[in-house]
Amino acid sequence: MTEAFICDAVRTPFGRYGGALAGVRADDLAAIPIAALVARNPSVDWKQVDDVYYGCANGAGEDNRNVGRMAGLLAGLPVEVPGTTINRLCGSSLDAVGMAARAIKSGEAQLIIAGGVESMTRAPFVMGKADSAFSRSARIEDTTIGWRFVNPLMKQQYGIDSMPETAENVAEQWTVARADQDAFAIRSQQRWAAAHAAGFFKGEIVPVTIPQKKGDPKVVDTDEHPRPDTTIEALAKLKGVVKPDGSVTAGNASGVNDGACALLLASGAAVDKFGLKPRAKVLGMATAGLAPRIMGFGPSPASKKLLAQLGMTIEQMDVIELNEAFAAQGLAVTRDLGLADDDARVNPNGGAIAIGHPLGASGARLVTTALNQLERTGGRYALCTMCIGVGQGIALVIERV
């Protein structure tokens, strides 16, 4: 079996909801990092790309009709390069990277672009068709995040807890205190601030140029969501989003964001053929299921499953990129994996609480950030893992080469 190498990885800045990227169509946003890969790797014959695997959790708006295919075309890839869209909700783009690696390892592909996109700002309101003449069953649904067009059997059998409600469930089941959640959130903000000040994100972010009605175009080159000046006292004053005395708040949860990310994966033969520099190889990926109402705990069983398959341990990981959907689930997972709350390996440059969580792009962002961190520190292994709505977890391990 051949190796699957990551040769390049780039992302847009992650924008706030209604922020700097609000005016960028989802399909145009998806194309930006792919176009950057093309510009950064002039030795590649782009007609030789076997496929584009792109994650997207919505698909109801401008990201409809297979945004993976549209992103490739809009980025200028030859029409001969196919594309597909993968939807595993929050884990979509991490799944895309893992599936690309599997295709290359099996020998079915030599060169694949994998990544994902989400414009949560531009997620539309949608209305289903009435089920009969003069019916009053039609209703408008907001597709930004969470449940819509709920199946009554799903509600009856599994419940339809909102994402914050699932985080409260995890906090209660695993006894994660509010103070610990706020401390986790502060660490995320502080670590992002330190990494930003050191210029760590410059190598992974491609600026987005936005034309203005008057004057020069606006250039967005920095993540918009972080709040580095947040204090523990300010977080403590926030009310719970599920219930007034709840532990999950806007301050210890990830954001609703816009962004895109893309990676170039290649076989050893493609690396040699196109003069690419292999930066890491994908060792494996695993997924796991659990009750939807505690979906945030998903990274723990997924990570344990993958590490067992690889014959590895959590102690071998030099970097652990755990998507911070909520501080509550992040702490429940790290504690179950035997990690200290402030383990320096976990999100060393901040996580989604600071950076943001544009659903379909976040997994690829984890791999991109982990890759750069391994190269900066000389580390060898990185674990990237996420929780997924409706009760799943996903994990992927890379090795620096």
Task: Report residues per predicted region.
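Conserved catalytic cysteine-centered active-site region
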Residues: 24, 56-111, 141-147, 157-163, ...
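N-terminal extracellular/periplasmic Venus flytrap/periplasmic-binding protein-like
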Residues: 11-12, 23, 27-32, 43, ...
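Active-site-proximal alpha-helical scaffold in enzymes
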Residues: 86-118, 171-200, 262-269, 334-335, ...
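Condensing-enzyme catalytic core mediating Claisen C-C bond formation in acyl metabolism
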Residues: 1-24, 145, 150, 231-297, ...
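Conserved active-site "lid/cap" helical segment
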Residues: 1-71, 75, 82, 166-178, ...
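Flexible glycine-/small-residue-enriched beta->alpha junction loops
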Residues: 111-169
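Active-site pocket-lining segment
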Residues: 54, 168, 201, 212, ...
